[in-house]
Structures are given as structure tokens and as C-alpha cells.
Swiss-Prot record:
It comes from Carsonella ruddii (strain PV). One of the primary rRNA binding proteins, it binds directly to 16S rRNA central domain where it helps coordinate assembly of the platform of the 30S subunit. One of its GO terms (molecular function) is rRNA binding. GO terms for biological process: translation. GO terms for cellular component: ribonucleoprotein complex; ribosome. The gene is rpsH. The keyword Ribosomal protein applies. The keyword Repressor does not apply. Belongs to the universal ribosomal protein uS8 family. This is Small ribosomal subunit protein uS8. InterPro entries: Ribosomal_uS8, Ribosomal_uS8_sf. Keywords: Ribonucleoprotein, Ribosomal protein, RNA-binding, rRNA-binding. Part of the 30S ribosomal subunit. Contacts proteins S5 and S12.
Amino acid sequence: MVMITLINNIIRLINSYNSGKNICICIYSKISMLLLGILIEKKIIKSFFVLLFKNKKKIFVIIKTIILIKLFSKPSNKRYIKNKYLKKIEFNNGLIISTNIGLLTIRECLKLKIGGKIFFSII
């Protein structure tokens, strides 16, 4: 269920950017907050804030730029990677991996020497 929420939020960000909007409303979850924190570090979004809207929490995201986001793992097709294969990946700057600690970039996974499920890449 968490995977569907994250994929839905990423697709919402891409669609709102492609339609020319700077603000996107996303579904609130703790892992979505981790994802948005990583996207701020990568300078893809400017900022985000949480508001209570009709007794439900929503995340309002201000988008800066989205170059290209490619989803690897889907609910029906999960792709895992071990620690020893992380160094062989060519586009190691924008790969986001879901681990037992949470969502991490590939550089953080190399420092901690852990693998996980490949979630998406930012190209």
C-alpha cells in the first residue's frame, strides 16, 4: 500500500509540472515526507508544507523543475539490488532505494553498505 501512495505522489508531481502548474497537492504519509525531503536535496522541488484539509492531512508541494523520473519498481514487479552491485550502476546520482531504514539515495546506501528495492531514478 505504501508503494502505491509513493507512485501516485510521483505521478502527481510529474503531471502538475507538465501541465504548467507550480503547486501540487499530494497524499500525506510519513514515507512521502521522506521522499519530498530527498527531492528538496536534489533541488527538484522548492518546498513543501502540510495542511489539514477537511480533517485529512494533505501535502502542498511547490515544484521547481523535474527533468525526468523513471519508475523501476511497481507493485507487480519489484526489483531488488544487493550492496555489492551498487557500485556498478552508471547513473548513481539520482537513484532512490527503499531500504529497511527508509528511502535513501544510492550514495547513502554505499556509505551504509546496505541494499534494497530500487524505487525510481532522477535523470
